[in-house]
Amino acid sequence: MEGRLNNMWRLTVNESKFVESALQSELRVDGRGLYDYRKLTIKFGKEYGSSQVQLGQTHVMAFVTAQLVQPYKDRPSEGSFSIFTEFSPMADPSFEPGHPGESAVELGRIIDRALRESRAVDTESLCVLAGKLVWSVRIDLHILDNGGNLVDAANVAALAALMTFRRPDCTVGGDNSQDVIIHPPEEREPLPLIIHHLPIAFTFGFFNKGSILVMDPTYVEEAVMCGRMTVTVNANGDICAIQKPGEEGVNQSVILHCLRLASSRASATTKIIRDAVEAYNRERSSQKVKRHHTLAKSEVLGPIVVV
């Protein structure tokens, strides 16, 4: 993604020198310290499995859907999930409409790798009929505004959407126990996904030939930095994934330093996500109670006739 930004949009020489000189004094253009994170805000839509995340000036929206498909032959009793990203030209002039570009594929791959390799989502619980039908979960990420560090914002958006997604309940019946019945939400409560832990992504930018390290780089900083690395950890301190694009090498001490910084913040970010999801679930539960109360009251009073 660095190449796309550097090729499509460049700072002037004076602007680049100003950013670098400020970083050498451990200052950043937006007033943060080198390892400070921008404000993270999470909102949810009316439907299950939709979220909108704002990280500073970066906006990302996520939608989760699911459908019944045939399982992979090598995993007959496991469901699957996939990630698709859409970069709108409205979010960044360097984004081009049409098929996903290299940067969109890379963004989806980073998030997919952390979820898949850490086994965060229980794919076995997505099996309906072994060898025949499983749930395939799809995560769509839409970049609304690129203010820098798309990976971290998209990662949180995907996790928040997964935690609030509900799939229809299914039962297997028939004479040969091969018939699948999908129950509507009015008949049976939809089921949440089983998520074992939350892999949180933290992206670091390198400046001045790797001698300066910052956390959560902005759009302007991404145009100046010489490299990046994304570290994904959970609240327990487990390493889920490390992604280092580009050809620049990174010393082992720098990697360990990034891991320590990411681990120290993972619990706080996890709490922000869980608190937002709990507030959303409480709001939906209260609305459901009000709706049922209104329906029961109308049934007691009978139909209202307007003359």
Swiss-Prot record:
Compartments, as annotated in UniProt: Cytoplasm; Nucleus
Keyword annotations of the record: Cytoplasm, Nucleus, RNA-binding
Any GO BP annotation: RNA processing
Entry keyword RNA-binding: yes
Disruption phenotype: No visible phenotype under normal growth conditions.
UniProt main location, coarse: cytoplasm
Family annotation (SUPFAM superfamilies): Ribonuclease PH domain 2-like (SSF55666), Ribosomal protein S5 domain 2-like (SSF54211)
Summary of the tissues where the protein is detected: Expressed in roots, leaves, stems, buds and siliques.
GO molecular function, one term: 3'-5'-RNA exonuclease activity
Keyword Glycoprotein appears in the UniProt entry: no
InterPro entries: ExoRNase_PH_dom1, ExoRNase_PH_dom2, ExoRNase_PH_dom2_sf, Exosome_comp_Rrp42_subfam, PNPase/RNase_PH_dom_sf, Ribosomal_Su5_D2-typ_SF, Rrp45
GO cellular component: cytoplasm; exosome (RNase complex); nucleus
Family: Belongs to the RNase PH family.
Described function: Probable 3'->5' exoribonuclease involved in the regulation of cuticular wax biosynthesis. Can perform exosomal functions and partially complement the yeast rrp45 null mutant.
Name assigned to this protein: Exosome complex component RRP45A
